[in-house]
Amino acid sequence: MLSMKTILGASWLVSARLGGRAIDVVTVLVLARTLTPADFGLTALAMTLIAVADTVLEIPLMQALIRMKFVEKSHLDTAFTLGILRGLLLSFVVLAAAWPFSIIFHDSRLTALVAVLAIGPISRSLYSPSMVKFIQQMSFRQAFTAELIGKILASATAISLVYLGGGYWAIAASSVVGSLAATLITYLLAPYRPALSLSKVSEFSTFLGWFSSAQLVSALSWQFDRVLLGYFVTKSDLGQYTMATDLAVLPTQSLIGPAMTPVMAAFSRIKDDRERLRNAYLKASRFTMLLAVPVCVGMSLTSDLIVNALLGGSKWKEAAIYLQWLALATVFSAYYSPLYSLALAIDRPSVIFRLNAIELFFRILLISLGLYFYSLMGAVAARGAVSIIMFFVALATARKLIGISMAVEVGNLWKVGVSCSVMALLVLLLRHELAGRDLNAIIELGFTAAFGAAVYIGALFVLGVRLKAISKPVE
């Protein structure tokens, strides 16, 4: 089951992510009114190289430590040493690739921008390994504090720099300062005396092998569209697409992603009891979609209001069109999150590798075809097709891992689907009634969102869903 302690732990992480995203929204609101889509496109292109290198070279030290029943000082030293080695390797790879990258994309500014942006992921490699003790105890207040303070300092730096005339460097500064600050704060919250050692590396190696391979494929998969578009479309168009993509994934990154850490810890505790694990997985997947589906559908229905309220001006109008469809694509991809945690908890990282490889294949095939035949909207449509395919792949994978039939998995979600359909219909009717009344975008967005949320919660109530039941096992 998902215990109340797990839910409280998830609440801390979700609160941290929501607080951080709220700060990000304020930062973007300021930057988008000062900078141009081309500035965001340039930074997104530089971040693509950083993201690929960061993901490929990622060592899931915290996840590996969480799975251990007994964590000694030697384990922490090994994790810290691996983090340093990873940071050094990342520095070398990024600096070596920065200049060729700028030549390929015909923009000399990318060299310096890539070098500076690399400081962020390098600093995250040095995160205090002692934080694992809090995670194993289901205490996430410390992670909440570190992330939130980092976001506040990052936002203050970015806003100050843009008003001082720093241009696109304000975006880079936000990324770097946030990571540096969060890492430093972890040492205040979870003190650790650094020591170099690889004495326990064998206990990390099996887990890291498959996981690193999966990360390589994942990096190529998630950054493929930006690399492809960066080469064939203008930086302004790339900026519009990137902004829409970042807004579309806000629900899963803010609500779902952070909640999966305590869920994985809970799965790990009951992995030897298959029946309890099945019940817990069904509850986690239902709760994931309970949150993700209405938010993503709501974003799709109000994409024009979101862009007008947050970004302002006609220069971002194409982002609203892309967001309308990318938000829907995110609905199905959210279902992957609990499956990811399940695979790690039961020591099956090879499953993640296979899933990522399947997704990469379809992304390369469909996004390339979509861009070739229908330009940017074709790429957006391809993203939706890939997410639907991966949803059914995830259903089949869960059946193989813990013996849950696809019919049971889909049946576990039907009330969410019906409630969201009712919400979508009534929100469309409301927007039709409000059309032409010349309301302020922020006011209309707030009213529409509140109306949609009330309808959705009411529909769930009518269908017998009670949110308090989340702390009870699934029957």
Where are these regions (language model features)?
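Interhelical loop/hinge segments that connect adjacent transmembrane helices in multipass membrane
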Residues: 1-2, 6, 141, 145, ...
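N-terminal membrane topogenesis motif
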Residues: 1-25, 58, 63-66, 71-81, ...
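Signature of the first transmembrane helix
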Residues: 2-60, 86-100, 115-118, 150-159, ...
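Membrane-interface helix-capping segments at transmembrane helix termini in multi-pass transporters
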Residues: 4-6, 32-46, 68-78, 91-119, ...
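Short runs within selected transmembrane alpha-helices of multi-pass transporters and secretion channels
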Residues: 20-24, 47-50, 54-66, 116-135, ...
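Alpha-helical transmembrane segments of multi-pass membrane transport and lipid-handling proteins
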Residues: 34, 81-106, 112-116, 156-164, ...
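Helix-loop junctions and terminal segments of transmembrane helices
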Residues: 56-73, 77, 135-136, 244, ...
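Membrane-proximal transmembrane or re-entrant/amphipathic helices at the cytosolic face
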Residues: 399-406, 413, 425-475
